[in-house]
Regions:
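N-terminal Rossmann-like NAD(P)+-binding subdomain of aldehyde/semialdehyde dehydrogenases
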Residues: 1-105, 134
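Conserved small-residue-rich beta-alpha loop and adjacent elements
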Residues: 87, 91-144
């Protein structure tokens, strides 16, 4: 099993690769993720059912169990959310401000990927997918 430092290093290395992906590749990957979620719906619901049972058996409070539970509508929203992210403008490389200095040097302020986005959360399978989609679109790796 990998330790947390090793996982973080792998995320950082992946961040380099994601930061140079072109918009078309990112959008194709997002649509492929949405399709794979749809194609694996039954398996995802089966695993989620096991997670919910384990949560209840371990005394997790009902509010967290509810957040953990995938419903048909939550699943549809999750898949459609990935497709929606694919339709958004690519934030990478967007120029927000710029000017030419007296010496002729052009100075611009533009958006670039962070590299790795770390997120701490619990009991929300849809958040996993949302974060992954947003990080992919913005050229970042994620560490969940």
């Amino acid at each position: 099993m990998l330790d947390i430092k090793e996982i973080a290093k792998k995320a950082r290395n992946a961040g380099y690769d994601y930061s140079i992906l072109d918009t078309k590749s990112k959008n194709e990957a997002l649509y492929a993720i949405a399709d794979e979620l749809d194609n694996n719906r039954e398996a995802i619901f089966s695993v989620n059912k096991t997670d919910v049972e384990n949560a209840r058996n371990n005394g997790l409070n009902e509010a967290l169990v509810d957040r953990l539970t995938l419903t048909d509508s939550r699943f549809r929203e999750m898949v459609e959310g990935v497709r929606k992210v694919a339709t958004l403008d690519d934030p990478v490389g967007r120029i927000y401000d710029g000017r030419t200095l007296p010496n002729g040097l052009t100075l611009v302020k533009k958006s670039v990927p962070f590299g790795v986005v770390g997120v701490i959360y619990e009991s929300r399978p849809n958040v996993t997918v949302d974060i992954a989609a947003l990080c992919l679109k913005s050229g970042n790796a994620c560490f969940l």
